[in-house]
Amino acid sequence: LSVTTYAMAFLYFIPSYILYYSSIKSISKQTEIREEIIDRAKHNKQDQAIIPDYYFPPVLHAGPSLDTFNSEAMSRYYGIDLKITAPGFFDYSRAFNFKPLNINAKICNNVYIKSLWIYKQQMGIKTFVIFEFNKNPADSLDENTAMFISFKTKDGKIINADVDKKTFQIDGRWLSGRAINGIDSNELESITSGTWDVRTGARTNENITEIIK
């Protein structure tokens, strides 16, 4: 084979395979979480199991593609009524399979960010941050109040990490996440979190929490 052929394989087919394998691995972990929820609900003789929909990580190109078919007709297969909820825009399996940074950063009153995960989803894909809250912030904040989150790095850089106050409940845990470029958990010094008034833009609560690894 020519040098050009080898170069094409390296630049296209190998990265494509790595991305596809990574996506399959993520889906497998999500399946384990869903089935654990279902098994527990059946063991407890519940009428319904609430499971998150799949989050499908992107692959390099349209084909091969992951089978995104997901129907509540699966209830017949599992023998229990299934309610499938939105998964968010992050790989929630990370929050069940990897050690978090425990931070206990206050948003307001009795609402806290308990912990967070920072991960690079796949080669060439943005870094993601997942936050776990002790409760759904939306239940404690009125329509005129939003929350803010930012990181401060050891060299003084401020990185915006805002997420919506409406979080995703997965197996009794309140999670939210977003993509953030250029963030490294080893370089983080503190997290600033709190609330602000959407009418005036003024901060109504601000808290700084040191990040200790």
Name each model-derived stretch.
Residues 6-9, 13-212:
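Intrinsically disordered, polar/acidic, low-complexity terminal segments
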Residues 1-4:
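Cytosolic-side transmembrane helix boundary signature
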